[in-house]
Amino acid sequence: MTDEKETRCSFCGKSQDEVGKLIAGTSGYICGDCIDLCHTLLHEEIEAEEDESADEIEEKLPTPHEIREHLDDYVIGQDYAKKVLAVALYNHYKRLRSGHKTDAVELSKSNVLLIGPTGSGKTLLAQTLARMLNVPFAMADATTLTEAGYVGEDVENIIQKLLQNCDYDTEKAEQGIIYIDEIDKITRKSANPSITRDVSGEGVQQALLKMIEGTIAAVPPQGGRKHPQQDMIRVDTSKILFICGGAFAGLDKIIEKRVHVGSGIGFNAEVKGEQDELTLTDLFKQIETEDLIKFGMIPEFIGRLPVIAPLSELDENALISILTEPKNALTKQYQALFGLEDVELEFTPESLKAMAKKALARKTGARGLRSIVEGILLDTMYDLPSQENLAKVIVDEDVIEKGEKPKLIFK
């Protein structure tokens, strides 16, 4: 009996009489109170780590001005679109940190619709934003999407791509950004609802609705196919920022028709002069929901993309700047590649102008610049590792306009 009374908890020192029951270990005892305390402390530590992780992201969240400045380092022009995106991104992640509610006011998602011609920087803007915040990023082509049950890519495959890009970490995926390109290609075939199935148009818009607004998407693990007995990974899409982009060719005519009431016919009609002509950018800034509905987007889908950022067409000066100014400018990239072979690469100002003109003629925007540069340097890069004593390669306007070889200068 004496030994029993002297048995005490190794942590708090209380006797067995005080605590009722002790659990014996290899070199001591622990009471129920200390077990509860340990459990509480461990739980608090786990919560603190989660809060610290959230605070870390909070601290990293840049202001709209800082977001805009970062975009300026990689994307030339598009000032209005950058400002719209900076505010939308900031508000979206602030919403996540607040738990979607502030004083019982529920904060809505600020998904973004980018409207602009091919090669104007829509994809680059989305990629740059994701890279800046170090969040997972996935890109999908709307033209490959179909409704579930039809041949093509299921809309939930987009979430799967996002999961793959963060090693299937659900929490990280739920803070990610998804960019859906060519969104203008999934318009319904007519402005009136159809009784026939439109599996790659209105049907896809309907399938994307819930995902963009916010739902719990069930995704098969590690890229497998769905089957009834399978355990699914569940992802809350209400926390994911969706950015959709498209050229929307012909939308400007719909806007112009609405904006310009005067038809220019009849004695009292308002005749438009040259000064009344609006640029594509000016027209897109006046876009209304009704214009997108007339274009073929369903009202419910447009309602899930409240932030619209129009991008302007790139002129010759903008294309020249794209070639030389950004941190990852094309000319800098190729100069770095040649530098690895201890060879200097020079582009004359005239050659830059010629490349910009060529891209404008092809109507491919900034996207076409890489293929132009790659084309003129292909043979040189092919021979480069075998060339001895090569010191410098010069690209002038004749290389672009006449198809001549770049000038080689040897040591």
Curated annotation (Swiss-Prot):
GO process terms (BP): cell division; proteolysis involved in protein catabolic process
Binding locations of Zn(2+): 9, 12, 31, 34
GO cellular component, one term: HslUV protease complex
Pfam families (UniProt xref): AAA_2, ClpB_D2-small, zf-C4_ClpX
Sorted UniProt keywords: ATP-binding, Chaperone, Metal-binding, Nucleotide-binding, Zinc
InterPro entries: AAA+_ATPase, ATP-dep_Clp_protease_ClpX, ATPase_AAA_core, Clp_ATPase_C, Clp_protease_ATP-bd_su_ClpX, ClpX_bact, P-loop_NTPase, Znf_CppX_C4
Residue ranges of every copy of the ClpX-type ZB domain listed in the record: 1-50
SMART domains: AAA, ClpB_D2-small, zf-C4_ClpX
A single GO molecular function term of this UniProt record: ATP-dependent protein folding chaperone
Matching PROSITE patterns: CLPX_ZB (PS51902)
Superkingdom of this protein's organism: Bacteria
Gene3D superfamilies to which the protein is assigned, alphabetical: 1.10.8.60, ClpX chaperone, C4-type zinc finger domain, P-loop containing nucleotide triphosphate hydrolases
Binding site for ATP: 117-124
Task performed by this protein: ATP-dependent specificity component of the Clp protease. It directs the protease to specific substrates. Can perform chaperone functions in the absence of ClpP.
Subunit structure comment from the entry: Component of the ClpX-ClpP complex. Forms a hexameric ring that, in the presence of ATP, binds to fourteen ClpP subunits assembled into a disk-like structure with a central cavity, resembling the structure of eukaryotic proteasomes.
Matching HAMAP family: ClpX
Family: Belongs to the ClpX chaperone family.
Name this polypeptide is given: ATP-dependent Clp protease ATP-binding subunit ClpX
Originating organism: Actinobacillus succinogenes (strain ATCC 55618 / DSM 22257 / CCUG 43843 / 130Z)
